[in-house]
Structure formats: structure tokens, C-alpha cells
Amino acid sequence: MGLREFNIFGRMKNVLFVFLVVTCIKTSAQSSFMDYQRNFPRVADALNRKADTLKKQFAAAGLQWPAREIYIRSFKFDSQLEVWVRNNSNEAFKLFKTYSVCALAGTLGPKRFQGDYQVPEGFYYINEFKPNSNYHMSLGINYPNPSDKILNADDPGGDIYIHGSCVTVGCIPIQDPQIEELYILAMSAKSSGQDFIPVHIFPIRFNNPKSVAYFDRTTKDDTSVQQFAAKLKIVYDYFEKEKKLPIISINSKGAYEIMN
């Protein structure tokens, strides 16, 4: 009996040791990420000018600073990009800011091949921080995602960013002052442990009658775009009701499905 107890406690010690090592490594990596970003003049300058203001805005909204967890969603026809924030995964998201998207390429509907000038539609996450972008600062998204790879042409394209300036051939530009804020928020969330910052891109606000009317009018002869948008709307509706993100999967045909 004593030997069995010894083995149990020995195993617990090993588990605890591994947990502590992994935690230390993750914390170190997060700290290193922030330190690395601060080495870039644009990031350091933006932090000096904007961090205090963002901190006060967070306090006024009842949010903890630095940002713990953020969610980004963008609406193509409505030319808006929202930033939602919450303090932890048990809370509902709160809308923090809405930025104007100052330029748009292409039409409604998903991106399907290199050079179509389309802004993607679907469910993504930030996979790159680019502090020395040609467009001031840029946040890359993981286009093409697994759905895009199934549904798209052999060359679906890539290099899709949320960035500064006000030009685009398929990205999401929100001008320099706004990308500085968003970059700081995303950087803070990543440094706080949010490895996957979701970015959802919708063709329209599905609760805006004018947007819905425009979508119906311009896609009336394209059932594939309509069917694709209907899948996106399910996720939109879920978030509008719950203020939390559903678990999203992709089936063998490339279609999005909600798992909860």
C-alpha cells in the first residue's frame, strides 16, 4: 500500500513539474514576443502614444488591461470592422470599438483564386504580426484556411492582411491610426496567452435590412454565393444571441458547420 501511494505521489510530482515547465516556457515565449515587437520603432511609438488611452477606455468599459482576449469581425458591404473583448473565456464578449474599412476590392462572395481581387469571407485567425509593413502595420490572417483549400482553385492566392493606409487589392485597410490601436490590442492579447485571435469576415451585416436587400439583389443569380453566405449567417446569428463564439468545424466538402 505504501509503495502504491509513493508511485501516485511520484506521478503527481512529475505531472506538476511538466505543468510548471510548460507554463514557464509559454510565459517566456509571450514575454519574448512583446519584447521583440517593441524593438520596432513603429510599435514602440504607437505604444507610447496610445497605450494609456486604450487602458482608460478599457477601464471605462469594465475590461482588464492589457487585453486578455479579443475577437475581430468585419463586414464587407457595410465597410466596418469590429473589435470585441472579454476578460476570460467564461465571459461574454463586449463590443469595444468599430472601425471604418476605408477601401474595398472585389464584390460580395468569397475569394476563390489568386488575382480575383476578392476579400475572403469565412472564419480565420491572425497568423502574422508585421510591424514594418508597407502599409504601416499589418495583421495577417490564415487565408487560405482548410475550407478555402477544398473549395478554391489550385492557386487560391494568399497574403491577406488587416492593415493601415487606404488601398487594397483584397485586404482590409483601416488607416494608420486605427491599425495602431488594433495592432496593440492583438499584440496584448497574444502576450496574455491568446494564441488564436479569431477573425470572421462576413459579406454583410445580416441584421441590416439595406445590406440584406443589396445582397439579395446582387447575388440573385448566384446560388453558390447565397448558400455559402447562409452558412456564415448561422455563426453570425449565434454570436449575436450568445456573445460567445461557437465551435466551428469544416466538413469534407469544405462547408462550415457549428458543433454546439
Model-derived regions, located:
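A conserved hydrophobic position in a structured secondary element of the catalytic/binding core
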Residues: I174
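Hydrophobic transmembrane alpha-helices
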Residues: F202-P203
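Bacterial Sec-dependent N-terminal signal peptides
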Residues: M1-M34
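Cell wall/extracellular polymer interaction/catalysis modules
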Residues: Q30-V169, P177-I197, F206-N260
